[in-house]
UniProtKB/Swiss-Prot annotation:
Residues 28-252 are cytoplasmic. Residues 1-39 are annotated as: Required for mitochondrial localization. PANTHER family: CARDIOLIPIN HYDROLASE (PTHR43856), MITOCHONDRIAL CARDIOLIPIN HYDROLASE (PTHR43856:SF1). It is a single-pass membrane protein. The keyword Cell division does not apply. It comes from Homo sapiens. The lineage of its organism: Eukaryota, Metazoa, Chordata, Craniata, Vertebrata. GO terms for molecular function: cardiolipin hydrolase activity; protein homodimerization activity; RNA endonuclease activity, producing 5'-phosphomonoesters; zinc ion binding. InterPro entries: PLD-like_dom, PLD_domain, PLipase_D/transphosphatidylase. This is Mitochondrial cardiolipin hydrolase. The chain crosses the membrane at residues 5-27.
Amino acid sequence: MGRLSWQVAAAAAVGLALTLEALPWVLRWLRSRRRRPRREALFFPSQVTCTEALLRAPGAELAELPEGCPCGLPHGESALSRLLRALLAARASLDLCLFAFSSPQLGRAVQLLHQRGVRVRVVTDCDYMALNGSQIGLLRKAGIQVRHDQDPGYMHHKFAIVDKRVLITGSLNWTTQAIQNNRENVLITEDDEYVRLFLEEFERIWEQFNPTKYTFFPPKKSHGSCAPPVSRAGGRLLSWHRTCGTSSESQT
């Protein structure tokens, strides 16, 4: 009986030693199997590529680019196509907080998400949504909720939150000029803390810009020395008319 007990104890000791030796390997394997939070950096200007497959095909965010596309544009990946994929991955909600929004491709992506039943909310700057080519009017016409500021300063944020878990932010204005010509950056991250902070900021602004709180004659914005009254957008010269909140354009 004593000999049997000794053998059992020895076997248990060997088993424990092997388990302890294998434990670090098991933990490393489990950690490697765990999905890592997304961290992606995009840099602009973006190469001009065809984005029709992303914006037209069912399940667009997963669609492959068509081999027989009649357009003469390249059909590879670009910073813009990667940004579109990140947006089109939305399944429940998309919150946009954007200073300027005139990119037709990004505008179509937002409308496509709305058509799929994704809840889309947009916060923007009241003056820059009056630019010729702005997508804001089209989004409103499609039934998407849009709120704007009435502050003397600009609503200068440039971020999006996808499904309350993915943050897209950076220097990029959502305009063709910025996408194709400017040195810009966009960070895409699933960092929980950053997503939480930006979501809190969005909700705060969304409530602050509630239309029931609007005043009929808000104070006019002052350009100051760093914001000239003339700007370029899409190759056109835009001259601001602050008294009516519109702009005129001349070809350059």
